[in-house]
Amino acid sequence: MFDEVSVGYDRMNTVSTVGIDALWRIATTRAVDPRPGQLVLDVAAGTGTSSAALARSGARVVAADFSPGMIAVGERRHAGNPNIEFVQADATGLPFDDDSFDAVTISFGLRNIVDPDAALREFFRVTKPGGRLVVCEFSRPPASVIRGAYYAYLEYGMPVFARLASSNPVAYAYLMESIRDWPAQQELAHRISRAGFERVAYRNLTFGIVALHRGFVGESKGDL
């Protein structure tokens, strides 16, 4: 499915969010806090838009995605960036050694993984002691008025944008369903903690349409 929408994926995201996705990306990058020389894993990186934002700090970024189509587009777009390496990978079985990354992040991809809990455990496995995880994902607005308006937009507004801007509106119908079915903020925080991360907290972006979760790996991880 993602292979079929890879070429127009970024355009559709910008159109359907009225450009707010750029602000969410800035917030995510700040939460990851990438630093020169650090190694960051960007899971479900798609065409590498978020990876490029992370790499501007001087960090080295591994952009991992399950879709060969997304990887191909990303490699073409970022061919001149020596700080980004694209890798085709399954988030539930990452091809990396334990304790490989200073930070792991995933934006708008966790809900599309068949077994999100297995993916979270993999994120914990490959993160170094003292490292951090940042998850940016669509969520559930806590205010009923905002939630109702948002769900109405998903039902009636986004399909219009999908038909105008996407080569595969059916794929975006699935994405809308996955957003509605995704757990609320507190439940996701619990699942991240259950995977092994400590000091898990979240903050809402755009009235809770998106939530930014962050957790840390304890320094004693290597003793477990």
Residue ranges and their predicted role:
Residues 136-191, 195, 201:
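C-terminal alpha-helical "lid/dimerization" subdomain adjacent to the S-adenosyl-L-methionine
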Residues 195-224:
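Core SAM-dependent methyltransferase catalytic element
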Residues 117-132:
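A short glycine-rich, Lys/Arg-flanked "PGG" loop and its adjoining helix->strand segment in the class I
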Residues 92-103:
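A short acidic, Gly/Pro-enriched loop at the edge of an enzyme's catalytic core
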Residues 8, 18-38:
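Conserved alpha-helix/loop element of class I SAM-dependent methyltransferases that forms part
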